[in-house]
């Protein structure tokens, strides 16, 4: 169905609202470019050409001051005419100053290249974080930088984003082997992952301990666990916005790493060296490959009783070329191919691939104070599960997305607005436990526009925003207002609040009742959906659309105990007003012959509602050589399926994460890190007994004396009314760097599950066999940089 065809079914009022938003956004550019004096530009590293993030930029003799963003861009607006000294300072780079003559109504561009300097470890990040906390609402957001990844003991000695995510507030992992990440009551499909603006449909490998991203190419990752502004949409729980860095524009560099779990290679360098006026062309290439299935048979044959080791394999390739211009405008083109394969004892074979290409760009108009960013991308994701004596399961997503974002600084205030288009074709085919086919093929396109205004007014920071979302396949228009507020009660105490409406039109083939299910398929806007839902009050609620929807309310405070000790407390409520789940109760085909059969027995998908609430407490300390991160999370997730309230399999009541990293030695060349995790037991459905189902294939003529069934029936207890034992695990690592000439060798040793805690993963109901999560796994890794 095309956009024009869908428009025929949208109401006149909805089309007028959407058209009005588009017109308003289009008119913002000239309105915001009115005659003012503006000083803007980019700050980059003189050594590599990379952006200098979070540098302080100020005009001496005035109240004007800002920080550079993750692209190194700064903009000082509403500057009165006159002569000033422009001062740039950074904890990582040597500062610079320049006398500038600001003319009334003129826009002045000044780009700077800063030289690196020796700094105290962590001081730059501490300073940048403190600045961010006093100028932005920053509700339920955690920023992960490359330096943060190294502070967490890593599985196999190689830092990985997924291991950093697991220690963030609100994150729950259901297992070391095939577990998924759940964020503040939201399931994995309700979490959007963006790579340089591109939607990544499966960002984590089946083993659950590795992501598809190479930590060496990550520049910054912003993780929003709720209450995010209108800039982001299409998901109802969380956003992970990951940015990659450009290759070195001055010299060729490389990195080779090996461990018992896998190997990786990173190469980067200039295709056209960075000149004195900027510009330049660079590349960066990354390749990761796991050989864990082979090495685990020798080194970790004790993991499984059959000695087969760990049956997980994956390969990730990524490449990027960046073109820069003298005025700071930039174009980057990238491509990737991620693959994953799991082979369980020759009984099942699961594999998926995710390949795509895209680009992003930054445009700095010479006569405007507006910064324009854009992205475009297309990808294909396919997953297939083959099992003995069962039909194959298959799912695919062919998708594209395009977006434009505009940013304008109004003194200490900021306006952001933009447009986004997302399209996808989904194909999904599977079978339930009794062999009934469940599947659908869909095409959908989403159109969105947003306006985000951040107001800094004394002690108040107010961030209202509005997102207009149109789902063309179902002709559904949704205005989604959002708000963020922060009040600076004192120099050390800041109170904050956020709320908003959210929606999405994509679901997962997994049910939230599945304990383990590596088959992760996608479907957009399912049509075979029940049309009535019995509410907890006994009323029948009509289901008039297939969207998943939610409301967020989050409040909390930040308190600076000292200059390096910070306390952050947040309480959250996510009201999931409509959820879609795979129907595990389907017994009949949905056709005219079965029209009298209840919908819950013939529809492919069912509708649920839910509520998630809890609180997260984060205590952080960081100085030159010591890093400490302590998180306690309390959470409660309840779902209503039209029959009962139940706890989904990821409903963990208590969760604790402690990370400690300590530099040792005169030059702090040694670093010791530890992570301890404690989680209360997850829900599961208990087995009450077994029975032999009667065989009545011949109806009333069946001879019940001899017609015994060969099948085994299971009598279940209440849905997820039981609780597994508590989970806890200690990981340790130690690393040391050796430098000579232009080479660095990093040696690290570590262990996962140091005291080999037997954490239960699941129990086979029929055989009673218990499957535990990963035992004690030691490792040594080498990393050579040149």
Name each model feature, range by range.
Residues 403, 442, 446-450, 542-546, ...:
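Outer membrane beta-barrel strand-and-loop segments of large Gram-negative receptors
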Residues 167-168, 212-253, 264-266, 273-275:
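A beta-strand signature from Gram-negative outer-membrane beta-barrel systems
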Residues 261-291, 302-341, 349-373, 408-415:
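Transmembrane beta-barrel wall of Gram-negative outer-membrane proteins
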Residues 34-123, 127:
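Periplasm-facing N-terminal accessory domains of Gram-negative outer-membrane beta-barrel systems
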Residues 382, 427, 472, 492-552, ...:
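Surface-exposed extracellular loop regions of Gram-negative outer-membrane beta-barrel proteins
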